[in-house]
């Protein structure tokens, strides 16, 4: 006669906690297994990492061609001459915030061509 899962669960449910502990120990010895829960390793945490979708373009340093960098900042941001100069003089400054990867790379390329040192964050 074969027992169903429901019958086994019902039988275990009628036992005391001590009897269940003894049953678990007997099953571990009989089948050569342990009832310990395996801990998740660092590989599981690494799988959750998502690709960044929004970037900030940070002007780290204007470099030697400051006038060209000011022009590039004006073109990218739409700022006036005074505001663009203040942003360049105050480096490091965020030039573009929350932009797509493509837009951030384009802005970085334009600023670097103008002579600036730029980072994407």
Curated annotation (Swiss-Prot):
Lineage top rank: taxon: Bacteria
SUPFAM superfamilies, sorted: ClpS-like, Ribosomal protein L7/12, oligomerisation (N-terminal) domain
GO MF term list: mRNA binding; structural constituent of ribosome
Pfam families listed in its UniProt record: Ribosomal_L12, Ribosomal_L12_N
GO cellular component, one term: cytosolic large ribosomal subunit
Record-level GO BP terms: translation
Protein keywords: Ribonucleoprotein, Ribosomal protein
Residues spanning the signal sequence: none
Gene3D superfamilies for this protein: 3.30.1390.10, Single helix bin
Membership in a protein family: Belongs to the bacterial ribosomal protein bL12 family.
Function description: Forms part of the ribosomal stalk which helps the ribosome interact with GTP-bound translation factors. Is thus essential for accurate translation.
Assembly information from the UniProt record: Homodimer. Part of the ribosomal stalk of the 50S ribosomal subunit. Forms a multimeric L10(L12)X complex, where L10 forms an elongated spine to which 2 to 4 L12 dimers bind in a sequential fashion. Binds GTP-bound translation factors.
PANTHER family: 39S RIBOSOMAL PROTEIN L12 (PTHR45987), LARGE RIBOSOMAL SUBUNIT PROTEIN BL12M (PTHR45987:SF4)
Record-given protein name: Large ribosomal subunit protein bL12
Species in which this protein is naturally found: Pseudomonas fluorescens (strain Pf0-1)
């Amino acid at each position: 006669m074969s027992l169903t899962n429901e019958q086994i669960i019902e039988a275990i449910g009628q036992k005391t906690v001590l009897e269940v502990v003894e049953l678990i120990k007997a099953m571990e010895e009989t089948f050569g297994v342990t009832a310990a829960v395996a801990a998740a390793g660092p590989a599981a945490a690494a799988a959750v990492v998502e690709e960044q979708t929004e970037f900030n373009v940070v002007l780290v340093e204007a470099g030697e061609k400051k006038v060209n960098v000011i022009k590039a900042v004006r073109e990218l941001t739409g700022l006036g001459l005074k505001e663009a100069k203040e942003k360049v003089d105050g480096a490091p400054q965020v030039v573009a915030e929350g932009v797509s990867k493509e837009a951030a790379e384009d802005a970085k390329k334009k600023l670097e061509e103008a002579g600036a040192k730029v980072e994407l964050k």
